[in-house]
Swiss-Prot record:
The protein's name: Glutamate-1-semialdehyde 2,1-aminomutase
Catalytic activity annotation: (S)-4-amino-5-oxopentanoate = 5-aminolevulinate
InterPro entries: 4pyrrol_synth_GluAld_NH2Trfase, Aminotrans_3, Aminotrans_3_PPA_site, PyrdxlP-dep_Trfase, PyrdxlP-dep_Trfase_major, PyrdxlP-dep_Trfase_small
EC number: 5.4.3.8
Length: 438
């Protein structure tokens, strides 16, 4: 199937993209934005409000990317805008402690079951890198287990793909990642507890932590199989391994306390990002006091940052988290209702067109996989027809709906998506699917 670029007037975006490639590698500051997976010209955005984006050519789109996850209440939420304006007038950074850091930390500790203490950083990547270092420092061990298809940022020991055999060491997935880093990273199959058990047994007393996306979001939205997270918890307890949940994507999205609240499995450490910053650059890692007290200056594990706990970002995060804390029952009931209606409507559209594709929805995130396989891990996700998805992406874009420009990224929505958006989405989706398969 040949994928044609969207028939949308993107002259200004195209001009910006060509200009950007002279000074920015690939013309973008994060690879997924380049539209390499779907083809065509990436959108250059001018403004956004609620569930809608406007690009540099004044085209408007209903947004299902949500800045890749942070916009649980939509773009330019008045509480966030006011908080950021007020703080900017007092200064954008001090390089010293502020009361707002304490208030945000208290909210995180109150909302997230595993978090007794929390350290603020500037990104999800910083959070996962710091958590892995902390787990190593706490246990005195070197190796970590991660899962194929789980993304934990661009830290060297996370950019590892599978080796040649089920129990081999990992190998670098990017130039610049050394074999020395790779040798301490073990790869397991997501949703395959027996594989994890074999890795632990083959590396007795050497594994510092198991890090997992409790709901995978970077190979499409893939929930954990029943018993998988519980099994990881039991395995870590039995072998004195630190269990780390990467909830950068799922934190505050699938429940007020994230996936750990939704599934009732409590990790030792949790990594957070996206929603916690209200759209500004914030990450965090937290967990048991006993482990967190190993972080400097209390303990020997070093981690620091000039802009960590930045007051501008903390004000934005506080606006979001305080709203979640005050209105969580209403908020998550609304999100669940939208998720259920969207999935049912999508399945109705698929049935009406005789298409046997797989849909996943968990809280305020989901995926439509262009495959009839039961998608439970990276291998089954990769059976999806990426050319068909690319054609679908452009068909939706032409009618004003912006989806992730990759089959293997989750869609996100928030409280800004209501009945009108649902109706528009499903009607447009029906036409787009029919067009792709005509």
């Amino acid at each position: 199937m040949e994928v044609a670029p969207s028939d949308v007037d993107l002259r200004t975006s195209r001009r910006f993209y060509e200009r950007a490639q002279h000074s920015i590698p690939g013309g973008v500051n994060s690879p997924a934005r380049a539209f390499d997976s779907v083809g065509g010209t990436p959108l250059f955005i001018e403004r956004a409000e609620g569930a809608y984006l406007e690009d540099a050519d004044a085209n408007e789109y209903l947004d299902y990317v949500g800045s890749w996850g942070p916009m649980i209440f939509g773009h330019a939420h008045p509480d966030v805008v006011e908080a950021v304006k007020d703080q900017a007038e007092a200064s954008t950074s001090f390089g010293a402690p502020t009361e707002i850091e304490i208030e945000v930390a208290d909210l995180v500790c109150d909302l997230v079951p595993s978090v007794e203490k929390v350290r603020m950083v500037n990104s999800g990547t910083e959070a996962t890198m710091s958590a892995a270092r902390l787990a190593r420092g706490y246990t005195g061990r070197d190796k970590i287990i991660k899962f194929e298809g789980n993304y934990h940022g661009h830290g060297d020991f996370f950019l590892i793909s599978a080796g040649s055999g089920a129990m081999t060491l990992g190998k670098p997935d990017s130039p610049g990642v050394t074999d020395g880093n790779a040798k301490d990273t073990l790869l397991a199959q997501y949703n395959d507890l027996s594989h994890v058990q074999r890795l632990v047994e083959a590396n007795q007393g050497e594994v510092a932590c198991i890090i997992v996306e409790p709901i995978a979001g970077n190979m499409g939205c893939i929930p954990p199989e029943p018993g998988f997270l519980e099994g990881l918890r039991e395995l870590c307890d039995a072998h004195d391994i630190v269990l780390v949940f990467d909830e950068v994507m799922t934190g505050f999205r699938v429940a007020p306390g994230g996936a750990q609240e939704r599934y009732g499995v409590i990790p030792d450490l949790t990594c957070l990002g996206k929603i916690i910053g209200g759209g500004l650059p914030v990450g965090a890692y937290g967990g048991k006091q006993e482990i967190m007290d190993y972080v400097a200056p209390t303990g020997p594990v070093y981690q620091a940052g000039t802009l960590s706990g930045n007051p501008l970002a903390m004000r934005a995060g506080h606006a979001i988290l305080s709203k979640i804390a005050e209105e969580k029952d209403r908020i998550y009931d609304q999100l669940e209702d939208y998720a259920e209606a969207l999935q049912k409507g999508t399945e109705h559209n698929l049935d009406a067109l005789g298409l046997d594709y797989t849909t996943h929805q968990v809280g305020a995130m989901g995926s439509l996989f262009f495959t009839d396989a039961e998608v439970v891990d990276q291998d089954t996700a990769q059976t999806a027809d990426t050319e068909a998805y690319a054609a679908y992406f452009h068909a939706m874009l032409e009618e004003g709906i912006y989806l992730p420009p990759s089959q293997f990224e989750a869609v996100f929505y928030g409280t800004c998506h209501g009945e009108d958006e649902l109706e528009t989405t499903l009607e447009t989706q029906r036409r787009a699917l029919k067009r792709v398969h005509s």
